[in-house]
UniProtKB/Swiss-Prot annotation:
One example GO MF annotation: ribonuclease III activity
GO cellular component entries: cytoplasm
Domain RNase III: 5-134
Ranges in coiled-coil conformation: none
Binding-site positions, Mg(2+): 47, 120, 123
Cofactor(s) it depends on: Mg(2+)
Function: Digests double-stranded RNA. Involved in the processing of primary rRNA transcript to yield the immediate precursors to the large and small rRNAs (23S and 16S). Processes some mRNAs, and tRNAs when they are encoded in the rRNA operon. Processes pre-crRNA and tracrRNA of type II CRISPR loci if present in the organism.
Protein name per the record: Ribonuclease 3
Active site annotation, chain numbering: 51, 123
Subunit structure, as described in the record: Homodimer.
Sorted UniProt keywords: Cytoplasm, Endonuclease, Hydrolase, Magnesium, Metal-binding, mRNA processing, Nuclease, RNA-binding, rRNA processing, rRNA-binding, tRNA processing
Organism: Wolbachia sp. subsp. Drosophila simulans (strain wRi)
Major localization class: cytoplasm
């Protein structure tokens, strides 16, 4: 575990004093590792904590960077910065996938490149840094990667779901209706199929590793469909 700590510390510029918390942050649920109380040890609890820490630090960073913006604009920026794809891309940047501890089946099925695994493990790593090193160290880590992303946003982004809702309101149509079509895959690596329906434009579906992302993808597909139909 010391060698793992040494290797990852060179990338994230933080060295853990508690090796066990680092190992927990990098352990995929597929390992089925148990502690002395026969409880499964994986990154899921730390992921829960890391998600909250990331949201807090990103919110504070945006508050400082954009002093003139209203809450709504800041919220749009934050939503984009803490979404699954953004977190997974940061995980790719630091090559976190190569450090995730998983069973052979998960690894052979592309687990090290799975976007949901990358998202979850990075959130867990953030939670672990917070526990091991406190707020100052975790802020340093998050700001190192997220501040440049925040500064790169010239304007608050408009997510597809919001754009689709505004389009229906503008055209005096009922609001979009989202429906979970099906959920497949194991509990630790699910895939959700979500459909969205717009009156006069039918229904489209999209799949993703989370309901939120699937809804955004479905909304994006519906906007494309509306654009094509409108141009006919």
């Amino acid at each position: 575990m010391k060698s793992l700590n040494d290797a990852i510390s060179k990338i994230i510029d933080y060295k853990f004093t508690n090796y066990a918390i680092l190992e927990e942050a990098l352990t995929h649920p597929s390992v089925n590792k148990r502690n002395s109380k026969n409880q499964i040890v994986s990154y899921e609890r730390l992921e829960f904590l890391g998600d909250s820490v990331l949201n807090m630090v990103v919110s504070a960073t945006l508050f400082k960077l954009f002093p003139e913006e209203k809450e709504g604009a800041l919220a749009k920026r934050k939503t984009d910065l803490v979404c699954g794809n953004t977190i997974a891309n940061v995980a790719k940047e630091i090559k976190l996938g190569s450090f995730i501890i998983m069973n052979n089946s998960e690894r052979c099925n592309g687990g090290r490149c799975n976007l949901k695994n990358l998202e979850n493990s990075l959130e867990a790593l953030i939670g672990a840094i917070y526990i091991d090193g406190g707020l100052e160290n975790v802020e340093k880590f998050i700001i190192q990667y997220w501040e440049k992303l925040a500064k790169g946003m010239l304007d608050p982004p408009q997510d597809p779901k919001t754009s689709l809702q505004e389009w229906t309101q503008k055209n005096k149509l009922p609001l979009p209706e989202y429906e979970l079509v099906k959920q497949t895959g194991p509990a630790h690596n699910p895939e959700f199929t979500i459909s969205v329906c717009i009156e006069d434009y039918g229904k489209v579906s999209a799949c993703a590793s989370s309901k939120k992302i699937a809804e955004q993808k479905a909304a994006e597909l519906m906007l494309e469909k509306i654009g094509k139909d409108a141009s006919v």
